[in-house]
Structures are given as structure tokens and as C-alpha cells.
């Protein structure tokens, strides 16, 4: 998938394997490089889209390129999903903290709005989603999912 403020997104597997076995990094360091120190953090030293926009506004061409690459990857992922949905897409909804960036959301909109209606709902609602899921389990509407055999690195 696309890179995000702190996650790398898709990577070339061969290069990743070489890096893992280079002896330069511990397992914990590699995990942090992929999630936490990847994405915008790896490229620009920040996970804050507002800071990236300030860099762009100040004429930083690298920041502009990285932000455009992020928009491109997001749009590409949306296009891939539209394909497997056989074009039956009701709407495209941009969410999360980066959705506060009009620059980013407008770039994505330009590339994908032909697929379906496009809307932006900025912010993160992970805690609300967890709470609502818990209520559904407590009300007997869903069964709790137990992840006993998840992969541990």
C-alpha cells in the first residue's frame, strides 16, 4: 500500500531482505524503520502533514515531491481497489490526520474523482471504532475475535 506519515508502505522485497540481514540493524530497529520511522518521517523527519506543507510553502522541492508521491501512492491504491470492485464503488472517503491537508487531498481527488464521489472526513476515529466494536460484542451482535495464532516477529 501507500506510505503514510510513519509507515513505509510497499517496499522492494529483495532490498528489504538484504537490509534485514546486513547486520546493521536489530529486529526492533527494522520493525521501527517500517512502522514508526518510515514514510514521511524517513523522508522528511516529520510525521506532521502541516510541517510538510510549511516546507512546501517555503519552496522545499523535496517536500513537494515527497507529498506528491504520497498522493500518487494513495490514488494508485484507490484505483487498485476500484478494479477489484469491478468499478462498483459507492464513494471514496479520505480520512485520518493527513486528510486535514488540502494539498494532499486535492491531489488525490484530481486522480480518483472520476471513479466515484470523493469526500474528505479529516481525523482519526480508531478509539470510537474500538468502543463501538466492544459494544457490539457486549450486546451479542458480534463474537469477540481471539488472535491466538497471530504472527510474532
What function would you assign to each model-found segment?
Residues 85-92, 114-117:
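Short, surface-exposed connector motifs at secondary-structure boundaries
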Residues 99-100, 119-153:
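Glycine-rich phosphate-binding/hydrolytic loop that grips phosphoryl groups
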Residues 89-108:
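Glycine-rich phosphate-binding loops at beta-strand->alpha-helix junctions
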Residues 1-46, 54:
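Glycine-rich phosphate-binding loop plus the immediately following alpha-helix
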Residues 56, 93-97, 122:
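Active-site proximal loops enriched in glycine and acidic residues that flank catalytic Cys/His/Asp
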Residues 107-116, 141-143:
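A glycine- and small-aliphatic-rich helix-loop capping segment at beta-alpha/alpha-beta transitions
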Amino acid at each position: 500500500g501507500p506510505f503514510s506519515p510513519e509507515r513505509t508502505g510497499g517496499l522492494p522485497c529483495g532490498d528489504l531482505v538484504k537490509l534485514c540481514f546486513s547486520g546493521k540493524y536489530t529486529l526492533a530497529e527494522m520493525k521501527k524503520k517500517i512502522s514508526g520511522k518510515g514514510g514521511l518521517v524517513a523522508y522528511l523527519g516529520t510525521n506532521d502533514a502541516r510541517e510538510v506543507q510549511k516546507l512546501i510553502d517555503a519552496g522545499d522541492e523535496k517536500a513537494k515531491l515527497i507529498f506528491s508521491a504520497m498522493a500518487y501512492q494513495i490514488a494508485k491504491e484507490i484505483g487498485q481497489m476500484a478494479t477489484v470492485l469491478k468499478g462498483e464503488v459507492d464513494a471514496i472517503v479520505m480520512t485520518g490526520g493527513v486528510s486535514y491537508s488540502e494539498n494532499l487531498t486535492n491531489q488525490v481527488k484530481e486522480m480518483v474523482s472520476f471513479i466515484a464521489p470523493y469526500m474528505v472526513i479529516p481525523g482519526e476515529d480508531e478509539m470510537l471504532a474500538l468502543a463501538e466494536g466492544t459494544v457490539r460484542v457486549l450486546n451479542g451482535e458480534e463474537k469477540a475475535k481471539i488472535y491466538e495464532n497471530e504472527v510474532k516477529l
